[in-house]
Swiss-Prot record:
InterPro entries: LexA/Signal_pep-like_sf, Pept_S26A_signal_pept_1_CS, Pept_S26A_signal_pept_1_Ser-AS, Peptidase_S26, Peptidase_S26B. Residues 1-6 are cytoplasmic. Catalytic component of the signal peptidase complex (SPC) which catalyzes the cleavage of N-terminal signal sequences from nascent proteins as they are translocated into the lumen of the endoplasmic reticulum. Specifically cleaves N-terminal signal peptides that contain a hydrophobic alpha-helix (h-region) shorter than 18-20 amino acids. The lineage of its organism: Eukaryota, Fungi, Dikarya, Ascomycota, Saccharomycotina. It comes from Komagataella phaffii (strain GS115 / ATCC 20864). GO terms for molecular function: serine-type endopeptidase activity. Its main location: endoplasmic reticulum. One of its GO terms (biological process) is signal peptide processing. This is Signal peptidase complex catalytic subunit SEC11. The chain crosses the membrane at residues 7-24. It is found in: Endoplasmic reticulum membrane. Component of the signal peptidase complex (SPC) composed of a catalytic subunit SEC11 and three accessory subunits SPC1, SPC2 and SPC3. The complex induces a local thinning of the ER membrane which is used to measure the length of the signal peptide (SP) h-region of protein substrates. This ensures the selectivity of the complex towards h-regions shorter than 18-20 amino acids. SPC associates with the translocon complex.
Length: 171
């Protein structure tokens, strides 16, 4: 394989990666969420959602309702949490802006999420903490992501296969 063919393959790989990145960012713009697709990592929402389910989020609604399943991030913790809204109330700021505050709980958990929230915080702020509301899901499809994340040999094997296929594919 000459240098020109190698450059073409490298450009094809760059095109695939940039297309995936543009798709992700475009989906984020449409859904108004930094993380429009997430994978369930625990059993806290069983039986509604199982470990490995892929969730599709929507974050364009001004408020969420009691009973909605939301994905939120806690300040200082990297992994988003998927739980159901248990309680909500609205607070008007000094500048007359209405903020929605939420209390959540996993369906399979005995207590609410108060202990998970940021230090000295009794509620989630809808605008600051919530990534989106779950609108659809695909069962079990996210297990591939979990396998790659939790198993370093699976990650190395997948990267090796990708590199090998790139080197062996001819145009």
């Amino acid at each position: 394989m000459n240098i020109r063919q190698q450059l073409v393959q490298l450009l094809n790989l760059a095109m695939v990666l940039s297309t995936a990145f543009m798709f992700w960012k475009g989906l984020g713009l449409v859904t108004n969420s930094n993380s429009p697709i997430v994978v369930v990592l625990s059993g806290s929402m069983e039986p509604a959602f199982q470990r490995g389910d892929i969730l599709f989020l929507w974050n364009r609604d001004k408020y969420v309702d009691i009973g909605d399943v939301v994905v939120y991030e806690v300040k200082g913790k990297p992994i988003p949490i998927v739980h159901r809204v248990l309680r909500e109330h609205k607070v008007t700021n000094k500048d007359r802006k209405v903020r929605q505050l939420l209390l959540t709980k996993g369906d399979n958990n005995p207590t609410d999420d108060l202990s998970l929230y940021a230090h000295k915080s009794n509620y989630l702020d809808r605008d600051e903490d919530v990534l989106g509301t779950v609108k659809a899901y695909l069962p079990k499809v996210g297990y591939v992501t979990i396998l790659i994340t939790e198993n370093k040999y699976a990650k190395l094997g997948l990267l090796g296969l990708m590199a090998l296929s790139t080197l062996l594919t001819r145009e």
